């Protein structure tokens, strides 16, 4: 940078002087030998215009014209002439190319004479085809006449075919009718399930709305809680500031006022006025007020007595009305409870009737009567086995409990006997005698405990539980668990039962087809 500044200080202008550049090269090739850049051939001087079949009109001395170079005079004149403005030279790595910018092509107007000439070449002659080999006839020809009906009887042969065709057509028509009815039933069934789905969708939307309301309520409560906490924080700050201010100023104010009062600069004019003027007047007024109070108390006592009597009378009347109202309400509640019980009983009976309807009354039946009876017998046997098992378990539990109690009582009696034996031995030792050889007996009224007898008595006292009644609900659940009845079969049977005579299975044609 220092060298550049020193270089700039040598000249009065800012730009550094440079050597003059030569615009022309020191050696230039002949213009006739230079290759022209690629351009549009429609405007190239070297391309002949006109029809290519026409004769070209060349100059008298074409060779001289081609080899003739530019004269020095023309070259000098061209160099001295002012050059027209042209496109700047291309940058390094690029070049300028002439392109066509005209809208239409040039029309060729030269007409070339034309003439038609034809010639015919004879086709090659092919070898004639080889004649077919026909062997010489051997043997004797015979002729047989076949009359109509000899080989094929149309009326006899077409009858079974016609019967088959007519039967197939009728069967196909019947199948199409049954298929249409089945499609109608399936469409109705689908619409029913669509209604159920829409109802479930509405319920889902209702639950989503409830959940959304809960979330909004939760957010609102949380916002309220945050606001409450903020208000409490502000209040605590204010209370703390107020307490600090009171604690800081209380001592100062009290000290200042005590000093002023003790010095005599401050006195209470109200106190002086009260002592001199107000207290005597107050005494007189108090005496008069007390006298009026005695009279007022007497009047109030009389009014209170009258009001108490009226209140007692009103209370008795209201108590009677309340008792009658309570009786009416109790009667109404009893009627409502009775009606609700009847309604629940009807609903329970309807629920109990549904399995009976599905198993025994639904047409077509989802299961045979023998299968239902077999399932009922199996469930009854299972119920009896369960009752017996429960009875055995109850007896075992009662026996275990009775055995434990009897063994505990036996242990107590054994301990009592040991205690009596020890007491008798101690008394004999005090008397200087030997202990009695016979074991002591139980006190009067105390019977020895027999564990096995108590256990047997407890087992005999256990009642046998009743066998659970087998209902149609149990039978239906049992058969569905075993796979004897499926949900699809029940739904299809209900749909057919609901359609009645409209169902394809109840159609007489379907019944005849099944019988066939």
Swiss-Prot record:
Feature: compositional bias, Basic and acidic residues: 391-412
Main site of residence? cytoplasm
* Keyword tags: Cell projection, Cilium, Cytoplasm, Cytoskeleton, Flagellum, Phosphoprotein
- InterPro entries on file: Radial_spoke_3
Which top-rank group of organisms is this from? Eukaryota
Q: How is it modified after translation?
A: Protein 3 is one of the 5 radial spoke proteins that are phosphorylated. Protein 3a might only differ from protein 3 in being unphosphorylated.
**Chain intervals for the UniProt region annotation (Disordered):** 1-32, 60-90, 388-412, 424-447
- List, as start-end ranges, the regions of compositional bias called Polar residues: 1-11, 62-74
Q: Give the CC-aspect GO terms.
A: motile cilium; radial spoke
Tell me where in or outside the cell this protein is found. Cytoplasm, Cytoskeleton, Flagellum axoneme
> A GO BP term, please?
positive regulation of cilium-dependent cell motility
Q: What the protein does?
A: Protein 3 may attach the radial spoke to the outer doublet microtubule or is required to form a stable spoke structure. Flagellar radial spokes contribute to the regulation of dynein arm activity and thus the pattern of flagellar bending. They consist of a thin stalk, which is attached to the a subfiber of the outer doublet microtubule, and a bulbous head, which is attached to the stalk and appears to interact with the projections from the central pair of microtubules.
Q: Which family does it belong to?
A: Belongs to the flagellar radial spoke RSP3 family.
What does the record note on quaternary structure? Interacts with FAP91.
Q: Provide the protein name.
A: Flagellar radial spoke protein 3
Q: Which gene encodes it?
A: RSP3
């Amino acid at each position: 940078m220092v060298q550049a500044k020193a270089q700039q200080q040598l000249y009065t202008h800012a730009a550094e002087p440079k050597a003059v550049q030569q615009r022309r090269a020191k050696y230039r090739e002949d213009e006739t030998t230079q290759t022209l850049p690629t351009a549009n051939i429609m405007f190239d001087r070297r391309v002949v215009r006109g029809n290519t079949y026409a004769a070209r009109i060349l100059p008298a001395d074409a060779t001289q014209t081609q080899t003739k170079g530019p004269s020095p005079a023309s070259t000098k004149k061209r160099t001295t002439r002012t050059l027209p403005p042209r496109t700047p030279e291309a940058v390094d790595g690029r070049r300028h190319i002439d392109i066509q910018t005209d809208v239409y092509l040039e029309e060729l107007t030269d007409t070339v004479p034309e003439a038609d000439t034809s010639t015919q070449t004879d086709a090659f002659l092919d070898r004639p085809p080889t004649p077919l080999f026909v062997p010489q006839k051997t043997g004797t020809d015979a002729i047989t006449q076949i009359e109509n009906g000899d080989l094929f009887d149309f009326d006899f042969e077409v009858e079974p075919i016609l019967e088959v065709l007519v039967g197939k057509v009728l069967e196909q028509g019947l199948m199409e009718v049954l298929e249409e009815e089945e499609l109608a039933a399936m469409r109705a069934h689908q619409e029913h399930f669509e209604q159920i789905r829409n109802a479930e969708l509405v319920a889902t939307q209702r639950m989503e709305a409830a959940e959304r309301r809960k979330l909004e309520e939760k957010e609102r409560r949380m916002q309220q809680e945050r606001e409450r906490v903020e208000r409490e924080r502000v209040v605590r700050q204010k209370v703390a500031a107020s307490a600090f201010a009171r604690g800081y100023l209380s001592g100062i104010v009290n000290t200042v006022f005590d000093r002023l009062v003790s010095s005599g600069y401050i006195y209470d004019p109200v106190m002086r006025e009260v002592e001199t003027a107000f207290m005597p007047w107050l005494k007189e007024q108090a005496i008069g007020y007390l006298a009026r109070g005695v009279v007022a108390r007497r009047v109030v006592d009389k009014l209170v007595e009258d009001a108490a009597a009226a209140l007692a009378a009103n209370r008795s009347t209201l108590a009677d009305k309340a008792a009658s109202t309570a009786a009416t309400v109790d009667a109404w509640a009893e009627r409502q409870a009775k009606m609700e019980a009847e309604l629940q009983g009807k609903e329970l009976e309807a629920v109990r009737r549904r399995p009976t309807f599905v198993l025994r009354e639904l047409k077509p039946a989802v299961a045979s009567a023998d299968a239902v009876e077999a399932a009922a017998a199996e469930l009854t046997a299972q119920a009896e086995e369960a009752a017996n098992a429960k009875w055995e378990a109850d007896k075992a539990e009662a026996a275990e409990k009775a055995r434990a109690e009897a063994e505990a009582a036996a242990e107590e009696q054994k301990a009592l006997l040991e205690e009596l034996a020890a007491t008798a031995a101690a008394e004999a030792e005090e008397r200087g005698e030997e202990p009695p050889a016979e074991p002591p007996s139980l006190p009067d009224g105390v019977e020895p405990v027999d564990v096995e007898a108590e256990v047997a008595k407890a087992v005999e006292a256990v009642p046998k539980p009743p066998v659970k009644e087998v209902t149609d609900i149990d039978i239906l659940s049992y058969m569905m668990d075993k796979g004897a009845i499926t949900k699809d079969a029940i739904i299809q049977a209900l749909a057919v039962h609901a359609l009645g005579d409209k169902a394809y299975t109840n159609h007489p044609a379907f019944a005849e087809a099944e019988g066939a």
